[in-house]
Regions:
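A short, N-terminal "cap"/entry segment at the start of jelly-roll beta-barrel domains
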Residues: 2-53
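A short, acidic/glycine-rich surface segment
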Residues: 41-42, 62-66, 94-95
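Short beta-strand His + acidic residue motifs that chelate non-heme Fe in jelly-roll/DSBH
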Residues: 43, 67, 86-87, 110, ...
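Conserved short histidine dyad/triad with adjacent acidic residue
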Residues: 55-72
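Extended, hydrophobic alpha-helical segments
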Residues: 58-60, 87-88, 96
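His/acidic/aromatic-lined binding-pocket segments of jelly-roll/cupin-type domains
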Residues: 67-68, 74-79, 100, 107-108, ...
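Glycine- and acidic-residue-biased ligand/ion/polar-headgroup-sensing regions
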Residues: 72-85, 89-90
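Short acidic-glycine-tyrosine-enriched beta hairpin
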Residues: 91-112
Length: 123
């Protein structure tokens, strides 16, 4: 997982702006705002940003996803159920990737030029 060669995601969305970068989290693991709760249930705010894509990933135990980097694209990954082991390091380095286990109800952020991969320890 995250060895020497990385695939570049060719989906360059738009050039980054300095203003856009100021809204990014400082750390990969994102602190979520408190949910709005009433007798009907709750609404959990996740991402309050303009975006061009949203996806849902379902993966089997033991699989690897991503294992690449993006030139200008960035994304958030919210874990609905289960967990992921998220690995990341600056693109172009040989340093050992940092691993963060992200559980249900947690979210991780990936900026451009960060090698990243996810493994799934459970279905």
């Amino acid at each position: 997982m995250i060895k020497g060669i990385f695939m570049i995601n060719p989906n360059v969305i738009d050039p980054l702006t300095a203003e856009e970068k100021t809204r990014w989290p400082d750390e990969p693991l994102v602190t979520l705002d408190k949910p709005f709760v009433d007798v009907r249930g709750e609404i959990q705010p996740l991402v309050d940003e303009l975006m061009k894509s949203a996806v849902l990933i379902r993966s089997k135990k033991g699989t690897l996803r991503a294992n690449h980097y993006h030139l200008t694209d960035w994304h958030y990954c919210y874990v609905l159920t289960g967990a992921i082991d998220y690995f990341h390091r600056p693109t172009g380095t040989d340093e050992k990737p940092e691993r963060i286990t992200v559980g249900s109800g947690q979210m991780v952020f990936t900026p451009p030029m960060v090698d990243h991969g996810m493994t799934f320890p459970e279905d």
